[in-house]
């Protein structure tokens, strides 16, 4: 990851509108990870990541910033809700499962990368196995005709050509494939580690078992290709890479951290609040967790926590946890202008998504600037009058706005083949204006 903070912010701007302070903070945190890896080994161990606390209302881009950041970094990433965890000793998930899930995400990520890397070799091997099934080897007999091998080779090349052109896709063959170890165990909360161990045990017991199956060539080719790719992937090497990636580049996003903060001066013991915070402390500070990859040290994993803090304040978190989240970033509520930009500027914006979806049925729609502006105003008004859910309000409004068009897209396509349906201010008002004005209706429908 050699992108500069400026380049990271530029890339985030393609997907997220506004929130420049938050983008700068995460860009610097990500760049510092690269800087740390350039240091001498003895100094590198001492440099720990500066964890981030994002504060802001729902739907302003907190989660999206973290998600896009992980894609940019090509690093193991996991998003969890703080409310899902309980204090150790109580029924529920313990916080160490966060690191176990991060390890699983890393294994999946690296396995997918390795499968892509060996794809061509796997395809060649799969092709040979399918051809072997289509053309069984002739038994050796007394006839030692020298022309036979050449004839076999010509036949094989002919079948190879037909296979690649898809002419044999529907032909049924019998082929030997690995038997899937189909053991799925569901466990009560808090017993995930034992479940993983049992699943690994049963999977190893079934390893190596093979059986003959009758399949169509197209299905068999995919199955055999995946099997050959798995065989070409070195599991030990993959685990070593995944372990290093988790420890040195892992990113954990903890959402709804405000829900485990003690609200004001409320008394009493609350299992789901202060206890969870105290369990998170060693994880964020640095400890060792047992996972599928072995022992994972959390010292250099970057933690990004976020919360709306409507009913509580960051100062309501236990002091030790506040100290472990030194970088504070406040995300601003969205304005009508922000909504307008969200609808039109980002890569794969909402209006572009709906336009392309309807185009698949031959129906063209066009969002005019005045229509987008009016839609943004209504979204802001409804958020102000009812519950402020940020940019998520746009999904609700667009679904309502285009409900009739989506339902009758096939019929409308022939009627509007020459020119598109134009979504202007009048169209938006006719479909949403009355609902937006009526507070009771907008509370339930929008």
Swiss-Prot record:
One of its GO terms (cellular component) is HslUV protease complex. Pfam families: AAA (PF00004), AAA_2 (PF07724). One of its GO terms (biological process) is protein unfolding. Transmembrane segments: none annotated. NCBIfam families: hslU, PRK05201.1. A double ring-shaped homohexamer of HslV is capped on each side by a ring-shaped HslU homohexamer. The assembly of the HslU/HslV complex is dependent on binding of ATP. This is ATP-dependent protease ATPase subunit HslU.
